[in-house]
Amino acid sequence: MSDFVNDGHTTPEAFVQHIKSLGRYDFPEPAIVDPEGMGIVAIGGDLAPETLISAYAQGLFPWFNDDEPIAWWCPEPRCVMQPTDYQPSKSLRKLANRSRWQLTLNQAFDEVIHACSLPRSNGVNNDLNESQPVGEHTWIHDEMIEAYTELHAQGFAHSIEVWDDKGALVGGLYGLKIGGIYFGESMFHIASNASKLAFWGLMRLCEHSNVNLVDCQLPNDHLMSLGAITLSRTEFLTQLDILISNSSDNWHKNSHKPLAVPLLGSLQPWQLNL
């Protein structure tokens, strides 16, 4: 498999239904099984690529600790970011302008997801989903790492890396893309502001790739400070059906050149490898 693109010969409705039906499990309607908006809508299943793609296409994501059964969530409200609305702070712009760091796409997925899985006490700060459960090894345990690494191998899960001027990985993020939406999973930083630069890089990449919404799942102060907003679950699911049927640029290991951090503030898009 690879990232789905509607070839134009299939109606958007049929295309969306095809993606939703990929898995072998029938997920329930969130509004029916969770009318109070607590967030959890199903228990069980597996983390096979087809199951995950089907779940994400229906607005669900897995969230569970290592010693718990697989739980599927569709929170109310939903935290999202529109790439065109993102405005970095003045201090981050100043930092980027004088930085000698660079960003890459899909060059160190294994390292990024491993760094995101480390407890904060290890000197690694995991920023994206602070509201999610943090156990001994956080919620990104071996089963999750294996599942998303396979999604990466199949072309769905993607990472953005931040490298310092000595070539050390100091920050990054990962998530998956279906059509015109990117589902953010987690990000980390070892050096100050590295995850903010990774997020800015994601916004730039999405803006120039026809990815019109980034799903941040659960709101927290960090995300809201970056310009995220919340949507009702109903509104999010309505937009999701439209977005997953949209075509967007293909992201793979060699699709984009490294991006010097000072270029984040320019109008120049993240350059493709031609």
UniProtKB/Swiss-Prot annotation:
Its EC number is 2.3.2.6. It catalyses: N-terminal L-lysyl-[protein] + L-leucyl-tRNA(Leu) = N-terminal L-leucyl-L-lysyl-[protein] + tRNA(Leu) + H(+); N-terminal L-arginyl-[protein] + L-leucyl-tRNA(Leu) = N-terminal L-leucyl-L-arginyl-[protein] + tRNA(Leu) + H(+); L-phenylalanyl-tRNA(Phe) + an N-terminal L-alpha-aminoacyl-[protein] = an N-terminal L-phenylalanyl-L-alpha-aminoacyl-[protein] + tRNA(Phe). The keyword 4Fe-4S does not apply. It is found in: Cytoplasm. Functions in the N-end rule pathway of protein degradation where it conjugates Leu, Phe and, less efficiently, Met from aminoacyl-tRNAs to the N-termini of proteins containing an N-terminal arginine or lysine. It is an enzyme of class 2 (transferase). Its main location: cytoplasm. This is Leucyl/phenylalanyl-tRNA--protein transferase. NCBIfam families: aat (TIGR00667). GO terms for cellular component: cytoplasm. GO terms for molecular function: leucyl-tRNA--protein transferase activity. InterPro entries: Acyl_CoA_acyltransferase, Leu/Phe-tRNA_Trfase, Leu/Phe-tRNA_Trfase_C, Leu/Phe-tRNA_Trfase_N. SUPFAM superfamilies: Acyl-CoA N-acyltransferases (Nat) (SSF55729). The keyword ATP-binding does not apply. It comes from the Bacteria. Pfam families: Leu_Phe_trans (PF03588). Belongs to the L/F-transferase family. GO terms for biological process: protein catabolic process. Keywords: Acyltransferase, Cytoplasm, Transferase.
